[in-house]
C-alpha cells in the first residue's frame, strides 16, 4: 500500500511538472501580438500596440500570403505558406499600413503608441 501511494505521488508530481511547462510555453509574452491570416483577411485588421511589441502573423489559409508594408515603414515577409509565421518588432511609434502582395485587396494597420501610453 505504501508503495502504491508513493508511486501515485511521483506520477502526480511528474504530471504537474510537465503540465506547468506546457502551459508556460503557451502563454504569450506581454509585448507580443498575434495576427492570423485567414479567408483573405488579416485578423484583427487593426491592432494598437506599444512600441517594442513583436507582432507575429500566421498564415492559417490554404493559400500563400505575404505581409508587406504599404510605405516601406517596416520590413515585410516573403511568401508564407499554410502554417508559416513572420514576426516583426515595432520600436517606433506611428501608423503602419500593410497588405498582401499576392492579394492587394487584403489590407490592415498596426498603430504603435509610445511605451506606456
Where are these regions (language model features)?
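Extracytoplasmic copper-binding redox domains, predominantly the cupredoxin/blue-copper superfamily
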Residues: 2-11, 16-117
Amino acid at each position: 500500500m505504501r508503495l502504491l501511494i508513493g508511486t501515485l505521488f511521483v506520477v502526480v508530481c511528474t504530471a504537474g511538472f510537465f503540465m506547468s511547462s506546457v502551459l508556460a510555453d503557451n502563454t504569450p509574452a506581454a509585448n507580443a501580438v498575434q495576427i492570423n491570416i485567414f479567408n483573405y483577411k488579416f485578423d484583427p485588421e487593426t491592432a494598437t500596440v506599444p512600441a517594442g511589441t513583436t507582432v507575429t502573423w500566421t498564415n492559417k489559409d490554404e493559400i500563400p500570403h505575404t505581409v508587406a508594408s504599404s510605405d516601406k515603414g517596416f520590413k515585410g515577409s516573403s511568401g508564407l505558406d499554410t502554417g508559416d509565421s513572420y514576426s516583426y518588432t515595432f520600436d517606433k511609434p506611428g501608423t503602419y499600413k500593410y497588405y498582401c502582395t499576392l492579394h492587394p485587396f487584403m489590407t490592415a494597420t498596426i498603430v504603435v503608441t509610445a511605451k506606456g501610453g
